[in-house]
Amino acid sequence: MNNNTKKITTTAMLAAIAYVVVVVGRIPVVLFLKYDPKDIIITLGGLIWGPLTSFTVSVIVSLIEMVTISENGILGCIMNIVSSCSFACTAAVIYKKKRTLKGAVTGLLAGSVAMVLVMMLWNYLIAPIYMGYPREAVAKLLIPAFLPFNLLKSGLNAGFTFLLYKPITTVLRRTGYLSESAVEQNKKPVGLWLFFGAVIITCILLILSLNGVI
């Protein structure tokens, strides 16, 4: 399989997986806001194959969502792309420049901050248009709804991406789909595994609490 064919196949595979997890994995978080894990797939693709892969997959998945399951039209599609890219592409760009454990952690943390800041601004500017709410009403939801949602979303994205990266790249190398030089070989310290695991557990507990389950 030549490089161009492999890139097309990889992009299509990631887009298909990301779309499936959107369809089957939507979780209510706060009010009308739902979390889906597609950004984990998109970010893993970017960390392994570069930020352009993250961008391409996020566009493809968002367009498919728009014409199948989304009710928010083109503006909702754009919001999806901006949200995914602000996290995934930020992480992938930083990791591409520094393919080390520190680079991966820095990228994920920077992606989390970027997504929260970008989406707070975009929710204020764009959400009133496609939601049909007055901007004043949306502004009142920024702190009690949009901020915790984006913090939880970025926490889950960063945590699962970190924990899944090594196992997935190991499988890809063993199957010959990824060269040994294509990924960083450093082992993840136990402390970071525990940290990101704790982040995931905390986010899940908060979501359950917000939904009145616990």
Q: Model segments located where?
A:
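Loop-helix junctions at membrane interfaces
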Residues: 1-214
